[in-house]
Amino acid sequence: MKTSTKTFAIADTAANADYLTNTSEPLGETMTLNVGPSHPATHGVLRLVLELDGEEIISCDPVVGHLHRGMEKIGETIQYNQFVPYTDRFDYLAPLSNNIAYACAVEKLLGWELPPRGQALRVLALELSRFSSHILGVGVYGMDVGAMTVFLYCYEEREKIHNFYEQLTGARFTSSYTRIGGQTRDVPNEMLKEVLVFCDEAAKTLDETEALLLKNKIFIDRLQGVGVISREKALSWGITGANLRASGIKRDLRKLTPYLGYENYEFDVPVGEHGDCYDRFTVRIEEMRQSLRIIRQVIETMPDGPINMVDTKGTLPEKKKVLTDMESLIRQFMTTTMGVNAPAGQVYFAAENPKGELGFFLDSKGGGLPNRLRMRSPSFCNLSILPELMKGHLVSDVPAILGSFDFVMGECDR
C-alpha cells in the first residue's frame, strides 16, 4: 500500500471537523491500493491498481498476464487434434465449450459438417457447460456480496454436471472430448434419462436461488445502479455475452449466426434494461433456464446415426474397425502421425460461450499445422472496460462489479 508523503492534520476545531465530515471536495491526497493478483474478489490472478480518494476510486489500472502460457504459439507448433487438450485450459470452468468452438473452427477450414447426432451431442455438451459455468458464477457472486448459503445450493448442481461429464467424456474437469470431425465417444442412454431428471431438479434450484437473493434487500442494494454500462459503451468496448445483453442488446450468436443446428431449437434470449450488476446477474439466471429448455429439446429429438464424420480422410476410424480392417489401421496411423491435412486459407469461427463470444482465427498454408492461430477471448474484451467503469465507485463496490462480469483468467491471459 502506497500513500502520499504529505501529512494530513485533522483540526481540533468543531468547524473544521464539520467541514471534513460533510464536504464532497477532494482532500488533495490519494492512496494507491493493490487488489490482487492473489485476492478472492478477483476470481483468479487479476491485479487491479486502484487510486483512491478516501473510499472513492479515482482510477483503475487492470494488470493481466499472470497466467499467460503462450497458448496461441503452442497451437502453431502442433497438429490440430493435439491442440484440443490445451483448449480445456482456456475457460477451465466450461472446458467442453472451448473444445467444441476450436473443433468447429478447424472443421470450417476443412469444409466439414458433422452428422446430425454428432451436432446434437455437441449442443448437449455446450448447454451443460453453459449451465455449469453460470451456476458457479451465480453461487460465487453471492459469496462476493455476503450470501454464503446460495453457493452451497449452486455447487451441488454443478457437481451433478461434473458427474455427467465423467459419464460422457471419462473426465470430470479437463475433458478433451472433441476431435476434429467428431468426438471421442457416444452418450450413454442411461445418462440422457438422468439429465432429464437433473433438468427438473435444477429448475427448482434456480427458483430457490432467485428467491434467496432477489428478495434480499441488502443483495439488491449492493447491485442495483452499480457498474452501469450503457448500450453505446458496451458496443464500443467490444463486450459480448450476458454482459452485453444485460445492457439491452439482444445479440446471441446462437440466434444471429446459428451453428451445430441451434436453429432447430426454441429458446429465448434474455436481455436487461439498465446494464448494471443486477441486470448481469438476472440475465444469467434466465439464461440457465433457457439452457435447460434446450437440453430437454436435444434429448427429446436426439437422432440416430454416427457421431463422427464417416470415412473421411483425416478423421479417426472406429476402434473396432482398426482391429479388423487394414485400411482403417493405416488411416489411424496416418491421421495420428501426420495430422489433418488442411487446405490453405483463412477462417474465423465464433461461438456463444458462457463468458461471451469465443472466436478462433486460423490462417493455414496447407498441411497439418496452422500458420497462425488467434483466439478472441471474451473475458479479455469484457475486462477492458474496467478503467472507465470503476471510476467514481467505492472500494466496497469492487467485488460486486468484478463478480458481475463472471470472467476467467485462464482464457483472458491465454
Curated annotation (Swiss-Prot):
Write down the membrane topology. Peripheral membrane protein
Spell out the InterPro entries in the cross-references.
NADH_Q_OxRdtase_suD (IPR001135), NDH1_su_D/H (IPR022885), NiFe-Hase_large (IPR029014)
One Pfam family, short name: Complex1_49kDa
Q: What does this protein do?
A: NDH-1 shuttles electrons from NADH, via FMN and iron-sulfur (Fe-S) centers, to quinones in the respiratory chain. The immediate electron acceptor for the enzyme in this species is believed to be ubiquinone. Couples the redox reaction to proton translocation (for every two electrons transferred, four hydrogen ions are translocated across the cytoplasmic membrane), and thus conserves the redox energy in a proton gradient.
Principal place of residence: membrane
Provide the organism lineage as a comma list: Bacteria, Pseudomonadati, Verrucomicrobiota, Verrucomicrobiia, Verrucomicrobiales
State if Cell inner membrane is listed as a keyword: yes
Record HAMAP family: NDH1_NuoD
Location in the cell: Cell inner membrane
Q: Which residues cross the membrane?
A: none
Q: From what organism does this protein derive?
A: Akkermansia muciniphila (strain ATCC BAA-835 / DSM 22959 / JCM 33894 / BCRC 81048 / CCUG 64013 / CIP 107961 / Muc)
What is the recorded name of this protein?
NADH-quinone oxidoreductase subunit D
Q: Which reaction does it catalyse?
A: a quinone + NADH + 5 H(+)(in) = a quinol + NAD(+) + 4 H(+)(out)
Q: Which GO terms describe its cellular component?
A: plasma membrane
Q: Which GO terms describe its molecular function?
A: NAD binding; NADH:ubiquinone reductase (non-electrogenic) activity; quinone binding
